[in-house]
Design a protein with these regions (language model features):
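Conserved ABC ATPase signature
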Residues: 71-80
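Q-loop/switch helix immediately C-terminal to the Walker
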Residues: 26, 31-49, 54-57
Length: 146
């Protein structure tokens, strides 16, 4: 029996919801909603206040000329993955826990994601991730599991 702490506090539901964001492989969005509706829903459940210019700038970081009125079920696997990463960026909790964030992404998006990770780490954020790809970040620690 034991406990896990974060910033010298035992992690409970409140601390977990305020400080941690998990993005996994499972479906995280509603198929029948548009991208825009999914973004607004995701931000509302995480109590994130945003304005449209920040949202649009973030959308353009991962998507070039994507119609936000497109339904989620119409997206490719890679586009769905980009939406996950966009939501990660918009919610921006101190600790990100990610399951294989690079799968299904094109080269340009992987570069953008690495840049996003670098900025997160520069700002004293924490990223815990599992990946099948080689990671090309600076100043990170790895634990190789086989």
């Amino acid at each position: 029996e034991g406990s896990i702490t974060y910033n010298n506090l035992v992690i409970d539901n409140h601390i977990a919801s305020q400080s941690f964001l998990y993005i996994g492989e499972t479906n995280f969005a509603h198929d029948s909603l548009t991208l825009n509706q999914n973004i607004e829903y995701w931000l509302s459940i995480h109590n994130v206040k945003f304005n449209n210019s920040i949202k649009n700038k973030s959308v353009n970081y991962f998507f070039q000329e994507l119609n936000l009125d497109k339904k989620f079920y119409q997206l490719s696997f890679g586009q769905k993955k980009k939406l996950q990463l966009l939501l990660l960026m918009l919610v921006n909790k101190p600790v990100w826990i990610l399951d294989d964030p690079f799968s299904g992404l094109d080269d340009r998006t992987i570069i953008n994601l690495n840049t996003l990770f670098e900025k997160k780490l520069e700002n004293k954020g924490i990223i815990i991730l599992a990946s099948h790809q080689n990671i090309t970040l600076n100043n990170y620690k790895t634990l190789q599991l086989t």
